[in-house]
Amino acid sequence: MNGQKKNALGEIVIVGFALFSMFFGAGNVIFPPFLGMEAGSRWLEGFSAYFIADIGLAMMGMFALLRVGSSEQVLRRAGKLPAEILMCAIVLCIDPMVAIPRTSASAYEMAIAPNLSGVSPVVFSVAFFALILVLCLKESAVVDIVGKVLTPLLLVGLFAIIIKGIVAPLGEIADLPQISNVTVTGIKAGYQTMDALAALPFGIIILQSVTAKGYKQGKSQLRVVGGAALLAGVLLLAVYMGLAYLGATVSTQYTGSIGRAALIMAIVEALMGKTGVVIFGVVVGLACVTTAIALTSSAAAYFSELCRGKVSYKAFVAAICVFSAVVSNLGLDRIVAVAAPVLDVVYPPALVLICISLIMPKVHDFVSRGAVIGALLTSVLCTLHTYGVSVPLVEALPLYDLGLSWVLPAVVFGLAAQLVTMLPSVRRREEPARRAGEKN
């Protein structure tokens, strides 16, 4: 019994480390310092809002899929076909079309270019995705590779930089923030990372890995994955808070005119000199590799399952790596221009389904579909308005300034659907199915 508990604890640490790396990514390292710089003495307030809207929603996604059993079950409340369309759009837009190519571009910009200026970006991207291909080929080993090997190195580098910045701050923290509303800025920055969507594809490989190690559905799986999610959340809290504080310590030296990547590079160089730039390059490189591994593996696993195994996991890994290498060199901006509005549309209904799965898993599917329709209609109108089609009505909706204008329509449509389920005609039609379920 003690041996089983010890093994479970070890798995929690490994899976938790893997989840940390998956959500951390290379892009997210640049946001907390910039927010800390803008917020000045109110950096903790801005950071808290950012963390809740980013990692808070992402952890909700993890616990939602854990509660109902899988990522597919979270989305299936909207109906089988809508769920497949929604999941396919999420995986395509988050993984091979945007995030995976961006990992290579970020690694080159922040890790290679400052330290090895003579390396061609084309040659680097080919080498980068060749490495990702090799590390992703064994599906069941992905979580172990990330959790046991790469994440500890990543954490050592991150905490070395953060601790140096705490022990020897770079300057005084500005009394007044550079932005008008610190909390709103933090919420918008966290929400716009869309990390909650990443929980759905990441959940695929996490649950596969845990199940393959003998932790089946039930309390054992809940203990391992739930504990891992909490560990990842604590690590992300510590790292993001530390980075936000570093940004606050230079709030009297820089303004919003500096780029996000330039700010973190300037902080690292001021703290640790050229050695720090090299260490940070290693940190960013590891973050890019771990994120690319997670995204590639989860996308390949999903599409292989969608094809009912007719196309193998390894074939999809190879295809995704080749496609991402091409996109990272030839057309990332164009692909992002296509994918960004799609993500703007699908994010609100996906969040609705995550919240319902976590908070009200036994609610009638009519209610879920009603809430999804309300969120989807609003997100379509808001996206059209954002991209040049005038829909002035959406600006009058509550929470529009936060990007959360879909919340009220989702609630209203969900309540309307709940009233529909109470109609006598609907109850009579569902009575036979309910009785059959009780007998089983």
Give the label of every model feature segment.
Residues A99-S104, V277-R308, V372:
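Membrane-helix boundary/coupling elements in multi-pass transport proteins
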Residues E72-Q73, V239-V289, E305, P341-L343:
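TM-loop-TM module centered on a large, flexible mid-protein loop between adjacent transmembrane helices
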Residues M37, L65-V74, F129-L150, A212-Y215, ...:
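Membrane-water interface regions at transmembrane-helix termini and the short interhelical loops
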